[in-house]
Design a protein with these regions (language model features):
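Bacterial N-terminal signal peptides that target proteins for export
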Residues: 1-11
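Short, intrinsically disordered low-complexity segments
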Residues: 1-2, 16, 89, 255
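Intrinsically disordered, low-complexity polyampholyte segments enriched for Lys and acidic residues
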Residues: 2, 22-25
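Bacterial N-terminal signal peptides
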Residues: 9-20
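N-terminal secretory/targeting leader peptides
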Residues: 10, 25-118, 127-351
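Active-site-proximal, glycine-rich beta->alpha crossover segments in alpha/beta enzymes
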Residues: 122
Length: 351
């Protein structure tokens, strides 16, 4: 087996689901549209999802992965898949927030579930079924998680940002709900696809960007063109990446093969989360040694951001009702169920 596909534990997990690989004579050849052209790690996550699908289906399905922008807009992967331009896509559902804001509740947004809560909610508390029903009803695609990330690092910035005053007039690249929430802090927001983020920051078209994690951003090189690393990631407590499948292509598969695709997505989700979390633990010192300045936001900024995030979600729920109000209530009830977790999970930090 090629390194980086499936660990022994991952294969055991698939077998525990009652799934195995079964050779077939002819392969279905699929194309995968992705949102990623902003760094190799996210592209690797898409490729891992494709390889895991191939492995578990014993090559019943073969997938060619295309970089963001080569099979339609990188911010419109869902539409590319729905129309049948490609059979499958790998993206972040929050990019569809302009069509239906409920997407950010499943993708991760400021004030929402953190990574641990999201994992448990999706896989153990009915979140997955709700998410799939929503994506099919509103977007006409089959969807399942194909990657997950812990809290993002914050911002790479050409300007020092620590206080509420520092946010005033800050030109910030972002996406999803934060594009509407951050202006409450005084920032001016712009949405850019991954391929445009680095050159925009390099040329000073924008002052700061939020984009992923310490380890992922290290490979892109944002630290070379922006001196300041602003922490923590108040905008994104987690990010769940998804695979979307064209409905006609999905319906052509046997029930068993459909389950294998879902299993491949779950394996990819856990593996990617573990890889990024592990790499982040070692990436912090890299930035310090590279001469970057680490800036921790003042408590008043963090508190204000949380206040704005809750108010934003309440406003959208009141105005739009429907799916957004339904999912928001379910997630907030789940957050309350976790509100005492620190009492039985946390101890003093290591010295």
């Amino acid at each position: 087996m090629k390194r980086g596909l499936l660990s022994g534990g991952a294969i055991a997990a698939a077998l525990a689901l009652g799934l195995g690989a079964n050779a077939v004579d002819a392969a279905e050849r699929w194309s995968m549209a992705t949102a990623w052209a902003g760094g190799p790690i996210l592209e690797q996550a898409a490729k891992r999802a494709a390889r895991n699908i191939e492995f578990l289906t014993d090559n019943e399905i073969k997938i060619e992965v295309f970089p963001g922008g080569t099979m339609g807009s990188p911010l419109k992967v869902t539409e590319t898949v729905r129309k049948g331009v490609t059979e499958i896509g790998h993206s972040w559902s929050g990019y569809d927030w302009g069509i239906e804001k409920t997407t950010v509740l499943f993708a991760g947004y400021a004030g929402g579930l953190n990574a641990e809560q999201m994992f448990h909610w999706i896989y153990e508390a009915g979140g997955l079924e709700l998410y799939q029903q929503f994506r099919l009803e509103k977007f006409g695609v089959i969807a399942f998680p194909c990657g997950a990330l812990p809290r993002e690092m914050g911002m790479h910035s050409r300007k020092r940002v620590q206080t509420l005053e520092d946010f005033k007039g800050l030109k910030l690249r972002t996406a999803g709900a934060w594009a509407e929430i951050a202006p409450g802090l005084g920032a001016s927001t712009v949405i850019l696809p991954g391929a445009e983020v680095y050159p925009a920051l390099e040329r000073g078209v924008i002052d700061a960007i939020e984009w992923a994690h310490l380890s992922i951003n290290k490979t892109i090189g944002f630290h070379k063109i922006a001196k300041y690393l602003i922490m923590p990631g108040i905008h994104q407590p987690t990010a769940f990446i998804e695979c979307t499948v064209n409905k006609k292509a999905w319906d052509s598969l046997s029930e068993r093969t459909q389950k294998l695709l879902m299993a491949a997505g779950k394996l990819t989700t856990h593996k990617f989360y573990q890889e990024v979390g592990n790499a982040d633990a070692y990436a912090y010192d890299f930035y310090v040694n590279s001469g970057n300045e680490i800036v921790v936001l003042d408590d008043e900024v963090i508190e204000k951001a949380q206040e704005l995030s809750y108010a934003w979600a309440d406003k959208v729920a009141a105005e739009e009702g429907g799916w957004f109000a339904k999912v928001l209530k379910i997630q907030r009830d789940y957050q309350m169920a976790w509100s005492n977790a620190y009492k039985y999970r946390d101890t003093l930090p290591p010295k």
